A protein has these predicted regions:
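Sec-dependent N-terminal signal peptides
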Residues: 18-28
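Post-signal peptide N-terminal segment of mature Sec-exported envelope proteins
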Residues: 44-70
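Acidic helix-start/capping segments at beta-turn-to-alpha-helix junctions
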Residues: 121-160
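C-terminal motif of bacterial Sec signal peptides marking the signal peptidase cleavage site
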Residues: 34-35
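Short capping motifs at secondary-structure boundaries
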Residues: 97, 104, 113-124, 313-321, ...
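Short, structured beta-strand segments at or near domain termini in extracellular proteins/domains
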Residues: 473-487
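Functional-site microenvironments in short loops/helix caps that host divalent-cation chemistry
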Residues: 40-45, 66-67, 71-73, 78, ...
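N-terminal secretory signal peptides that target proteins for export/translocation
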Residues: 1-17
Length: 487
């Protein structure tokens, strides 16, 4: 019997997409609540004083620090004619956000991988082909009405004493290594499906269904033809291969701004060999992600696409725990390039690094970060490859490893003219490359430099880039979350 490759959907897919419909619903609910309040006489003699409301203080997200809003001079502080670096900073401002204290570790990313594994097992335990235990999937509400099915996470997987069908379901996500003969998790099955609503595209006037609302200048004629939009979708073939397509069609409603992605979440452990030819890095390939000794090291071999999938899962994981209160949190995401640089430099427009000095070491010769101190010498700073996160002192914002250790993905797309294209208020340039786009359109900005880079390349004011589907032994990531605050 051919084994099916299962794809796991995030819980967000079981909810109405949060587009303008969702936002309108939230506003309507708020207005309804306000209208149901007791209509007390105004203490201002009939003057409009506004509706009442409780104060709100956002709790600190686990493992994150608050980066207060601020302005700074973004870009190279100091030029270098030898390397073609031109000092051309520009003033920008960013709003407040939460940022992970450290890079995402192997341990945290494993939690994501194991969640996907357990989701597949639960899906199969509910499948009639594996015994059909209906307790693992909820298909009716409390009144017995049919609903869109979702997995029951309150039902534990029978790891210790499974019956025959349960054992088949559990073992179906594992494979026997043809070389070692050991049973191991099958990475090819670990696919995560998620949906992202494109709020920016949905808000643009040119994409409104009502032509009279696309242009307010009455001197300009507006076509009655429906706008043409592009959206990403994905599916699995019968062989279990991921297929991605970009569809262009006439706009029909908010659901057309909902993009679907399928991402295999397992890191590329072979990156250690492919990044360094003629080097003995096999132990890293075998052990770096799988061995518990590396749990607190930054995850690597993760593409920009996988980092985004993790961010979506992390958001959904928290919202599922918070219940109704979860709708009020901002999603976890990759930082914009401007946010990343501001956090790395701790808002200091004069600093090239996360520290104030121009050298990467103090007066005692102790290094401030994990990088390549000199040609051929990786170990002078005490490490050969990556180091445990938080090994070195944090910057003035309390954030660790913003220089060296691993370079970090940002959400920002790369183009040579990016500084001319972006605003000076929360600057960001996004380009969702279609599958058919030239490869150069799939470049994303990475920041911070890594354990393999010289001091020049771990400067906080310099950018680099990588293709969004590449998985490198020197690129990881961390998350941010926009602050809900009005101080």
């Amino acid at each position: 019997m051919m084994k099916k490759t299962m794809t796991i959907y995030s819980r967000s897919q079981r909810r109405t997409p949060r587009g303008s419909l969702a936002m309108a619903g939230a506003v309507a609910a708020g207005l309804l609540t306000a209208s149901c309040m007791s209509m007390r006489g105004s203490s201002a003699g009939g003057e409009v004083t506004g509706v009442g409301g409780s104060t709100f203080a956002e709790p600190t997200p686990y493992g994150m620090v608050l980066v207060d809003r601020g302005g700074y001079a973004m870009g190279p502080v100091k030029g270098d004619s030898v390397w073609g670096i031109k000092a051309d900073p520009r003033g920008v401002s960013v709003d407040a956000f939460w940022m992970d204290e450290t890079e995402i570790t192997n341990s945290k990313y494993k939690q994501f991988v194991f969640w996907v594994r357990d989701s597949i097992i639960r899906e199969r335990l509910a499948d009639p082909a594996y015994g059909g235990n209906e307790a693992f999937k909820i298909e009716e509400d409390k009144e017995g009405n049919p609903i869109k099915p979702y997995l029951n996470w309150n039902k534990p997987i029978p790891w210790r004493n499974p019956n025959e069908d349960e054992e088949r379901a559990i073992q179906s996500v594992y494979r026997t290594n043809p070389i070692t003969g050991r049973r191991e998790l099958d990475p090819t099955q670990l696919n995560y499906v998620y949906e992202i609503f494109n709020h920016t595209a949905a808000a643009q006037r040119k994409n409104r269904l009502d032509p009279t609302r696309r242009e307010y200048n009455t001197d300009i004629p507006v076509s009655d033809e429906l706008p043409i939009i592009s959206k990403d979708t994905a599916y699995l073939t019968e062989e279990g291969e991921i297929r991605r397509e970009t569809i262009s069609r006439a706009l029909t409603g908010d659901y057309d701004f909902l993009n679907t992605y399928i991402v295999n979440v397992y890191p590329d452990t072979t990156c250690w060999i492919n990044d360094f030819e003629n080097a003995y890095n096999e132990p890293y390939t075998r052990m770096y992600f799988s061995h518990a000794g590396y749990n607190e090291y930054p995850v690597v071999g993760v593409s920009w696409e996988q980092a985004n999938a993790f961010s979506n899962w992390r958001t959904d994981f928290l919202r599922r725990t918070l219940g109704r209160e979860g709708i009020y949190i901002e999603p976890y995401r990759l930082p914009t390039e401007a946010e990343w640089e501001y956090a790395a430099r701790a808002g200091n427009s004069e600093s090239m690094y996360p520290w104030e000095e121009t050298l990467p070491m103090d007066e005692r010769g102790c290094f401030y970060a994990n990088f390549k101190p000199r040609d051929g010498d990786y170990v002078l700073d005490g490490h050969v490859i990556t180091s445990q996160v938080g090994t070195y002192n944090p910057n003035d914002f309390g954030i660790y490893d913003m220089a060296g250790n691993v370079s970090e993905w940002t959400s920002t797309a790369y183009t040579e003219s990016i500084d001319k294209l972006t605003s000076d208020l929360n600057p960001e340039y996004r380009y969702d490359a279609a599958k058919e786009d030239p490869y150069k359109m799939k470049r994303k900005i990475v920041r911070g430099g890594s354990w393999k880079d010289a001091a020049l390349n771990v400067r906080s004011d310099l950018r680099s880039w990588e293709y969004q589907n590449e998985q490198r032994s020197y690129i990881g990531f961390r998350n941010v979350r926009s602050q809900i605050g009005f101080a």
